[in-house]
Amino acid sequence: MPLLDSFRVDHTIMPAPAVRVAKVMQTPKGDDITVFDLRFCVPNKSMMSEKGTHTLEHLFAGFIRNHLNSPTVEIIDVSPMGCRTGFYMSLIGTPSEQEVAVAWKKAMEDVLKVENQSDIPELNLYQCGTCAMHSLDEAKDIARDILKSQIGVMSNKELYLSEEKLKSLGN
């Protein structure tokens, strides 16, 4: 099985909250697609709650679009990581990590403005696969944690695992 890019970085030294360009690729027509690692929690130290992550998924995807989409950037998808330490964001364009960090911060401020559970978008049986698994309070706790710290920028060069280390890990 091929080793995915996300497993080529050293999770033991990964900071949070922080932004990382996880991948850049070009479509056959020449459009740039950038995948960002938006790390909310330090891996293997903490993780977002299940209900909070799910609620944040519903809120964050819309709010960050409000602050980052532009004539040169269009978000394709914002999805939580299975490890619940962050989100991946795929988009057309190449915004800087700093631009992404600013939009992320503004989106977290927007989360804190949501007043009621009933204000969570697409929270119904028809549009959500597990509509009972939500908590606005837990999503707000996650947002507050992000806003307490400055969102940093991760360096792939510093995080990449050497070929020697990957081999020693069985890859």
From Swiss-Prot:
Which amino acids does the record list as binding Fe cation?
54, 58, 128
State which Enzyme Commission number(s) the record gives: 4.4.1.21
The note on cofactor binding and number reads:
Binds 1 Fe cation per subunit.
Alphabetically sorted, this entry's keywords are:
Autoinducer synthesis, Iron, Lyase, Metal-binding, Quorum sensing
Q: Which Pfam families match?
A: LuxS
Q: Which cofactor does it need?
A: Fe cation
**Domain of life per record:** Bacteria
Would you indicate the residue range of the signal peptide?
none
Q: In its UniProt record, which GO terms are filed under biological process?
A: quorum sensing
Q: If you read the UniProt record, what top EC class would you report for this enzyme, in one word?
A: lyase
Q: Which reaction does it catalyse?
A: S-(5-deoxy-D-ribos-5-yl)-L-homocysteine = (S)-4,5-dihydroxypentane-2,3-dione + L-homocysteine
Q: Which PANTHER family match?
A: S-RIBOSYLHOMOCYSTEINE LYASE (PTHR35799:SF1)
| Biological role stated in the UniProt entry | Involved in the synthesis of autoinducer 2 (AI-2) which is secreted by bacteria and is used to communicate both the cell density and the metabolic potential of the environment. The regulation of gene expression in response to changes in cell density is called quorum sensing. Catalyzes the transformation of S-ribosylhomocysteine (RHC) to homocysteine (HC) and 4,5-dihydroxy-2,3-pentadione (DPD).
Q: Which family does the UniProt entry place this protein in?
A: Belongs to the LuxS family.
Q: What is this protein called?
A: S-ribosylhomocysteine lyase
What organism is the protein native to?
A: Aliarcobacter butzleri (strain RM4018)
